[in-house]
Regions:
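A general structural signal for short secondary-structure junctions and capping/turn motifs
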Residues: 2-3, 41-42, 145-147
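Bacterial N-terminal signal peptides that target proteins for export
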Residues: 2-11
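Bacterial N-terminal signal peptides
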Residues: 10-19
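Sec/Tat signal peptide C-region and signal peptidase I cleavage site
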Residues: 21-27
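Early exported N-terminus immediately downstream of N-terminal targeting peptides
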Residues: 28-100
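Surface-exposed flexible segments
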Residues: 91-107, 156-158, 165-166
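Short Gly/Thr-rich strand-loop-strand
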Residues: 98-134
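A short, solvent-exposed beta-edge/loop patch
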Residues: 130-164
Length: 166
């Protein structure tokens, strides 16, 4: 379960950076619009599956699936989840999606899991968060991009999430 450990480490890193006093606020509509643009651009591509869920549309089921990796406290405040899964996409589409993730560097605070931005098995991983209250550990937007042998996806969560060290 390398991905599970990766996500846990990412949540802990977000907590550590936030406790250092790095407050970073941004307009949510700009972030949501960037995610919607990526979904619209790649949803019809072969090998790419996009899904957005909100309350009443299966959000609780998605939270249950992510609970082990993200933690119950973190997911409690999530109001929407967008998942872009591209495990069956062509190499060109995978590379294009990696480049699309760069848009978040100007919108959110980036948290690297490793200095080389690579997972132990040679994959690619990046995490981003919009910190709204560093002292309380509150995040309004959270993006995680994973491209490894096990999983290729971009997950975007919005809401009022609380990051606690595990």
């Amino acid at each position: 379960m390398r991905i599970t450990n990766f996500i846990k480490r990412l949540v802990v890193l977000v907590a550590l950076v936030m406790t250092s006093g790095a407050v970073y606020a941004e307009n949510n509509s700009v972030i949501e619009r960037a995610v919607r643009e990526i979904v619209a651009k790649y949803d019809k591509e072969s090998g790419v599956k996009c899904m957005t869920v909100t309350k009443g549309q299966g959000l609780e089921i998605v939270k249950l699936m992510l609970r082990e990796q993200m933690g119950k406290a973190f997911l409690k405040g999530v109001t929407s989840v967008t998942i872009i899964e591209y495990g069956s996409a062509s190499a060109e589409v995978c590379e294009a999606l990696r480049k699309e993730v760069d848009v978040f560097t100007s919108l959110l605070k980036e948290f690297n899991v490793s200095e080389a931005k690579a997972t132990p098995n040679g994959g690619y991983s990046r995490g981003f968060a919009n910190v709204i209250d560093a002292d309380a550990g509150r995040v309004s937007d959270f993006v995680i991009a994973v491209d490894s042998d096990e999983m290729k996806s971009i997950i975007y969560m919005t809401g009022d999430m609380v990051v606690k060290e595990q």
